[in-house]
Amino acid sequence: MYYKIVELKVTNQGIHERKIFQGVKIFSRSKLSKDQKSILTQKLYLTPKQNIVYYQRTDVNYDQNWHHHKDYYELAYGQLDRETVFKVCQDFDELSPFLENELLEKLKEKQSAGKFFEKLDI
């Protein structure tokens, strides 16, 4: 009822794959690196079997430089080694290498209280 088909692009050593599963997004954020040259995108999904899917992608921040240097796009794209992480786990604690502990604790609280889904009669 709440779950949708999710399709994620995963790159591993230059080999492109697509991971397709049923899930619902429970967390998403994008943040700039300190040097503002790349963007880190992180997403979490919950599956019908109550597994947690973590997806992380690092991309070049084209907005930062392409208009300043006309061939930045070509240079950056040629050097781009897309980094993606796709991890399926049973518990939020398995994600401690990727997400801060305070956030993981909040997610665990929401899961144990059953607060990822709120059915509204509006």
What would you call each of these model-derived segments?
Residues 1-122:
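Terminal leader/tail segments of proteins
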